[in-house]
Each structure stands twice: as C-alpha cells, then as structure tokens.
Amino acid sequence: MKKKNIKNSMNNHTPMIKQYLSLKSQYPDMLLFYQMGDFYELFYEDAERISELLKITLTKKGYSNHKIIPMAGVPCHKSEYYLSKLVKLGESIAICDQQKETDCKKKLISRKVVRIITPGTVTDEVLLEENEDNFIAAIWKENNQFGYSVLDLSLGFFGVSKIFSSCDLLSEIERTNPKEILYPENFSDVFLIESRKCIRKRSLLEFDLETSYKLLNLQFNTCSLDGFGIEKNNFVIRAAGCLLQYVKSMNMTVLPNIRQLKYNYMEDSIFMNFSTRKSLEITQNISGEKKNTLSAILNKTVTSMGSRMLNRWLNSPLKNFKIVRNRHESVEALKFFYKELQFILRQVNDLERIYSRLALRTASPHDFVRMRSTLEILPNLHLILKKIKSKHIKKIRLSIGYFEEVLCLLKKAISLKPSKCIRDGGVIAELYNIELDELRSIKINSKEYIKNFEQKEKKKLMIESFKIKFNKIIGYYIQISKRHTHLIPKYYVIIQTLKNTERYSVPLLKEYEEKVLNSEMRSLLLEKKLYAEIFNIIEPFLEKLQNSALALSELDVLVNLSERAISLNYTRPIMSEKYGISLLESRHPVVECFLKTPFIKNSVFLSRTQRMIIITGPNMGGKSTYMRQIALIVIMAGIGSFVPARYALIGSIDKIFTRIGSADDLSNGYSTFMMEMMEISNILHNATSNSLVLIDELGRGTSTNEGLSLAWSCSRYLININKSMTLLSTHFVELTKLEEKEKFVKNFHFSAIKSDLHIAFLYKIKNGISKKSYGISVASLSGLPDSVLEDAEKKLIEIENT
C-alpha cells in the first residue's frame, strides 16, 4: 500500500488523530479499522483505498494539522460483511476497538488493536471460502533450491516441501494456491509471485535458522525435528519457522490446533507443472473460473470438508498404488449405499474448521450447535457403514468415532437456539447451572413485576396515561401525559420533559432496576465463565475430533466418487506396475457432459513398443480433446476415481507434461514461439520413461522448415533419450515419416468429410495419416467472406501444383 506523508508535525494534530496516527504507524501495510462509537472509521489513505475497493462514500472529518481529514466508515454491526470483501481482495486489516468509556467527556477514549485479519490467517466462518483451503505460505531460497511451507490455520494443517527448481516452485504454488505468501527481503525470484494478491517481504531475521529450529520444537514439544523428517533440512526449517512466527504474531496467541508438521514428499504424487495444470483445467479453467473443469464434473460432494479434500486429491494424484487400490475398492463397495450415506452426510457440518476454532477458543455458540447436530447423526452413519464389507471403510468408520460424552455435554450446556455471540448471553441452556437459572429468573420475573407495579400505581393515582417504559439511557421510567401532571405525588422525581409528556422516577423503581441490571451483569459473567469451561471439557477430545473430521471428509469423497461412477457410467481402472496405458472406448469426462449428442469414444494404447503416437487431422477435429482426455483419465485413476472408458489399464506414471495451446507472455517479452520452446525445453530436461507427454502442434510460430526441423529433433529426443509415453499432434505431414525411421512410433489421424467449402468432423481416431489439414474448410466456419475462401482455394491449388 502506498504511503503518504500525512504527519508533518504531530503537535499540530488533534488528540484523536494523534492517537490514530500512533496506532497506524504500528500497522503501516494494513487498513486500520478505528472504532468511533458504533462505526469503524478509516482516515487519510486508508479511507481513500477502502472507498475505492468497496465503493463506499469518501467524506471528511474536519481538519487536523490545517488539512482536511479524508474519512470513510462502516457500521460495526456490519463490519464482517465488509471485512469478508476486503479479505477476498487480498487486503489485511487491523481492528482497533474502544477499550473503556471515560467519565470525563473531554478525555480521549483509550483504544487498542485487538485483532489482526490477513487473507492467510483468518479462521472466522464468514471470512473463509467454504470449499477452498486457506493456505498461507513462506519461501526460502538457497543455492537455487527452495524451502516451501504452507499452513491452514482454519484446518490446523502445517506442511513443508523441499523444491529443486523455480519451475517446480511455481507448480507447487499453483497447487496449494496460498492466499498470502511470505518471502525474505533478499529473495531473487520475486517475479514468480509478484502477480499474486497478497505477498509480504519479511526481514531475514524472521528466517533465522536457530530461531526457527527452536520455535518448531517449542510448538510440537520436541527436542528434535527428526520425527518430521526435516532435522537437517535447513531450507524447510527456515521457511516453516518464519511462517509459524508470523501466524502466531497475527493471531496474538499460541496455536494449539497446529499439532504436527507434514513433510510433503514430492515423489509421492504424479508431478504436474503450472502449464500442465492450466491446460488440463483440473480445478480452474483457462479464465480462472471453476466451471467446465474436471472438479466441476467430479466434485458433487455434500460436505464442504469433502469438497476441499477432493480438490486436494485432484491436484495431487498418487503414485502409491496401494492407497489408490484401497480407494477403488471402497468406491466399488459403496455403490449400493451411496444414496442413504449422502442423505446422512448432508447433515454433517464443517467439523474440520470447527475443530480449529475450538482449539483456538474462538468457536461461536453456533459452532457448538453445528457440532452437536453433526455428532447426533453419527450413530446412524455407523449403522450403515457396518453393513459395508471393506477394510478401508471399516478403518474410516473407526476413525469417525461416536463422541457420546461431548454430545451429552453439548445437549445439556448449549441452548437449542443460542445467540450468535457469548457477549449477548442466552447461550447456556436452562437447568445446566442453578445459579444462572436463578439470575435469569429475576429478569424474566421483572416484566411481571413492572406490569403489576404499573397497574397498581395507575389504579391508585387514577391516571389514564400512566405507563412504565425502559430505554438504555435512562433505564426504567414513568411516562405521564402533561394533562395529568397535577395528579403526580411529591415523591415522584421528574427526569425529562417532552412536548406532550413528562418522565418520572421513583426510588422503588430505581432499586428494582439496579437489581435487574445487576442480575443481568452477573448472569452474563457467569455465562462467559461456563462457556470457557466447556472449551476445557472438550479439549481432551480435540485430536480425535480432528481425526473424525478427516475420516468424514474422506468418506464423503469416496461416496461421491461412487455416485459419479454410477451416474456417469465409469469403469474401475486396473492399476498396474507395468509400463504403459491402455484405454478402450475412452471419453473426455468434461466435454461429454456438455454435448447434446453422444460423445465419440476413442481408444489408446501406449507401451514399450509403441511409445509415441503422432496424430494428424484438421483443426477442431478432436486431436486436443483426445490428448487431454487421456491425461485426465490418468489423474482420475490416480485419485481413486473410476474412469470414463469401457476398459482402462494404467501403468506407473511419475509426471504429466502438456504443451497444448499458449498465449503470448508479452509482459516478459515472450512470444508464443518462445513460450513453446521454453515449455518443450522443460519437458526434454525433466520427462522420464514413466512420464506422459502431450504436445499439440510442435513447431508453430516460425518458418515451416524451421518448425518442422525442431519438431523432428524434439520428437526423436523424446523417443530415444526420454523414452516417454508421448502423444504429439501435428500439421507437418513430413513428421509422420518418423514411423518409418523409429520403431516406437505409430501414426494415427482424425478424419473429416468435405463437400464444397463445408466440412463435417468424424472425431474418430484411426490408423494412418491424414493427407489434408482442411484449413480452408475450417476457416469457412468462422464466417470469412466467400470470395476470400474461393480465392484461398485457388491459391492452394496453385501452390500444390507448383
């Protein structure tokens, strides 16, 4: 955020602005919400910024230091609505509350920052995206390698990775999608992250190795980090230490919900770089939206926990066939139970995030209600799960648990419909505490007492307009019409005169008011105490609650995959340690869902003797769709899903690379051709014999001869050096001659039928070569003038006959 010099001389400012500037200087990079009564007000550049971001009125608040004070504000009771918008925009906010009213009207009210909100450290339900993880990340670079750490405070997840290249770092950032990134002041690769919304430069001291090591051991109550696999991994220790320190300082508290550190072994999952994720549109489409993605088709989970877990799985398909086969076996076993299980799971609330708020002691009364309703349905869930004969489902069932003690406590202690916040009272249930019930009865009976007092006095004084009312400023008062004031006894004390009425007080009424107000205050204090005790009682169950939340999430995902398999006619894939991919009558999982006509099924066979498939055919003929569907089917199989094919055998895949489509990166001075060459270079350097490589129209963007030469040499490198499983589409017919020279290459094509200037695509892959690209016929579909198309046809005949 840009800073303006707004304090030439502190002495010339008003006391309130002096206080504001003093607080603002402690949080220069954040918007300061400064409480003024029932409003949060922002001044100077903060006011201008929030006015622009939220489209609220920019006004002024008088003068200070001989200058107008720009001001914008939001009501305190609506602050969460505005905070949610700001967090989504990547803004951070410091909340400054009034601390104590002063008896002297001229004396400045004391204020202090009571809460800091940043995009990566929020845990409040209203500030979080329901179906997305909310990671904050830290990066440390040394010797061209990176330590990368992520933390989701709302889930209690803390993880680290060691990354060996900037390209892999970009891929990991894309996979985890952190809402906030911390980096050291000497970080030389800022360009990798500068396009993200919220990045923060931190002092090198915050990445100090010794301090980080001590902080991590202190957090986990250990004397060594060996148990987490990072004892001598200085890169990740620095990143994790900085991250932990920052999150603690932002939350102004310890982090009891962070119970373990997970080391992410990159080799456990199928590697996909940034370009691959983007072109395959796994969880985001090319426009950055969620529609028309693999996730949009597969993710019909019924809990927010399950939705987040499935998206994590989609971004990290596994290489561990044992885990994958367990998932496939579970999906198969759940086929006969998914309807009744989904009915129950729809009643499961976000136990994962409730757990974190419980551990942080920020859980709201409504969190307890949601937790209670979730625990109430667990016995019914167990009854169904016990019917399913699956070892993995049994393991999940045992992890879910019952929590009878916690449920009993919540039923007794929390009202059926509590207020939103403990400070409003009405949270603790009746009969839970005798003293609280007695204090509440005073207030409840007060209405009857006041009513009786009013009727008695009205009858005694014979005043028709006699009424007893209450407001927060003067408390209980007697209101009488001015025409009856001559009937008022002398012991009635006048407290306010209005146009047509007068207001009075009497000692008896004041005494009762003090009794009621005192009981209300004592009642609220007791409720807060009892509320805190509930956290203490639940604390020993927190770890099991976290495990239960994870088990419920996985169950939701597996039940969802079972439903998808039946609804979309998917087949259970065979996972083989052998080399290759065999798919019979496969379909594109996303495209088939949006077609009004049946999807044309196609097969593929990749093996040690047929490592490369060269595909020719017209644009829009189905080449790119065909290549993408193979990669998407591999990903689906790798997360435990069934796949859109009649038969699927998936061998061991370590990486997926794609070079399908590219936009010019003009901001870095890269053309389409340069971007293509950089991506191909990355593939040639990193693909292995177990990698799946998809390349669309290699060699575009330069002269035909040069493009063909590059395509030829890159293809031979992939065949003989990388030995990867490769699908390559091309318009260079000459490239198909590789089949004659390299024994591992096979030519296939997509065909079309042409009549006059019109074309019909068949979308069926066949052996052999397509002699024509049908470019002019495809161009006719774009609406080019007939004269242009006719002229092009003539020129084509002329060139071909030359």
Curated annotation (Swiss-Prot):
Binding site for ATP: 617-624
Presence of keyword Zinc-finger: no
UniProt keyword terms in alphabetical order: ATP-binding, DNA damage, DNA repair, DNA-binding, Nucleotide-binding
GO CC aspect terms: cytosol
Function: This protein is involved in the repair of mismatches in DNA. It is possible that it carries out the mismatch recognition step. This protein has a weak ATPase activity.
Family: Belongs to the DNA mismatch repair MutS family.
HAMAP family reported in the protein's UniProt record: MutS (MF_00096)
Matches recorded under NCBIfam families: mutS1, PRK05399.1
Name listed for the protein in its UniProt record: DNA mismatch repair protein MutS
Organism: Buchnera aphidicola subsp. Acyrthosiphon pisum (strain 5A)
